Amino acid sequence: MSFPADSVGLVTPQKFQFEEPLHLECGRVLPRFELMVETYGTLNADKSNAILICHALSGHHHAAGYHHEDDKKAGWWDSCIGPGKAIDTNKFFVVALNNIGGCSGSTGPTSPNPENDNRPYGPDFPLVTVRDWVKTQAMLSDRLGISVWYAVVGGSLGGMQALQWSVDYPDRLQKCVVIASAPKLSAQNIAFNEVARQSILSDPDFHHGRYLENDSYPKRGLILARMVGHITYLSEEAMKQKFGRDLKSGKFMYGFDVEFQVESYLRYQGEQFSRNFDADTYLIMTKALDYFDPSREYGHSLTEAMSKTKCQFLIVSFTTDWRFAPSRSQEIVDALITNHKPVSYLDIDAEQGHDSFLFPIPLYVKTLRAFLGGEEHLKSTSLEAS
C-alpha cells in the first residue's frame, strides 16, 4: 500500500516502563507503570521543537500514520499531524501517548496487577485524574530529555490536560493549545457521564468490573454508553443533514428494530466502540472528566489558577458544540485576559458539533498552523531561550 504524501507513514509504538512508584491524587500508589507512546518527526539538536498531543476520552497514542501496510484507517488526528499539515512533522517532533487507565497498551484495568498474582486489575485499578495524567506525561518528558515542550496540544479531555500542564508545569511549555474544552464540567455534563456509567454498571455481564475473570463482557452497557455519548458529540444540524428522518427501508415497519437511519448509525457506532474499548477504562475516563477543576485548590477561582501560567495560549471553540459550548472556552479566555496573559481565541463556525476538533476545517487548520509557527519561529524562540 502506498500512503498519502502528507502522511507520516508506518509508525511503530514504543512502550516506556517506569519502575518508580506513582502516587496518585486518590491516595493510592501504582508500584510501577507503563506508557504506550508514538512519535512522529525528528527531535532537533537543542530539543526545542517537541509537541505533546493529549488525547480525549476514547483516544490513545495512535494519533497519526498507520501501523500496518494494509491499515484502512489512519491515527485519530491524522488530518492535522504530518508533513506539511497544521502540526508539521517536517518541523516538529510530535509525541502522542495513551494515558494510564487506558486500554491501548498503557497500564490500566486490563493490565496485570502485581499485587494480585498478576490477574487483571479490573475494578481494582485506582481512579486517576487529569493531574495524574499530566504528572506521568512530565515523567515521560524527562525520559525523552525534553525539559520544555514547544507546545502542549489537546482537544476535549485532551484540552483539559493541556490546561493542567500550564498550571502545574508553567516553566515546561511555551505554548498551550486548548480545543473544544472547558475549565470544568457542568452539572449537565456530569449527568451525561453518569447515565453512561450506569448503563455499564447495570449490565448483568459487568460482574462488578470483574468480567474478564468471569469470561464475560458488558457489551450491551458499553454500546449504550457510547450511543449516549455520541449524541452529545454531534450537533443537531449535523444530524439533520446526515440523517434527517430518513428511513432505512423507506417505510415504517411498526416495530422496535432499526427503522430510522440515525438509529442504525448509533447502533453501529456503539457496536464498533464495544469491540475496541474496555468498560472499566470507560468508567475511569468519565470520572477523570468529572473530577477536573484546576481552580479547586485556588479558592475555586479560575482567574487565580491561571495567574500561575507563563505560556502563550490558543483557545479554540466551535459554534455548534453544545457538549463544551463556546461560553466554556470564553471562561478560560476571560481568566487569562484578567491576568494579562497572552491568549488568542477563535470561535469557529462549524456544523460538526463537539467532534469538529477532529475535522480538517480550513480556518481551524490555518489558525493552528499559524499559532504553532514554523522553522523561523523555532529559531527565534531558541535564541530567546538561550
Curated annotation (Swiss-Prot):
Residues 49-358 form the AB hydrolase-1 domain. It is found in: Cytoplasm. Belongs to the AB hydrolase superfamily. MetX family. Substrate binds at residues 226, 355. The active site is at residues 156, 321, 354. Pathway: Amino-acid biosynthesis; L-methionine biosynthesis via de novo pathway; O-succinyl-L-homoserine from L-homoserine: step 1/1. Transfers a succinyl group from succinyl-CoA to L-homoserine, forming succinyl-L-homoserine. InterPro entries: AB_hydrolase_1 (IPR000073), AB_hydrolase_fold (IPR029058), HAT_MetX-like (IPR008220). Its EC number is 2.3.1.46. It comes from the Bacteria. One of its GO terms (cellular component) is cytoplasm. Homodimer. GO terms for biological process: homoserine metabolic process; methionine biosynthetic process. It catalyses: L-homoserine + succinyl-CoA = O-succinyl-L-homoserine + CoA. The keyword Disulfide bond does not apply. It comes from Acinetobacter baumannii (strain SDF). It is an enzyme of class 2 (transferase). This is Homoserine O-succinyltransferase. The keyword Transferase applies. Keywords: Acyltransferase, Amino-acid biosynthesis, Cytoplasm, Methionine biosynthesis, Transferase. GO terms for molecular function: homoserine O-acetyltransferase activity; homoserine O-succinyltransferase activity.
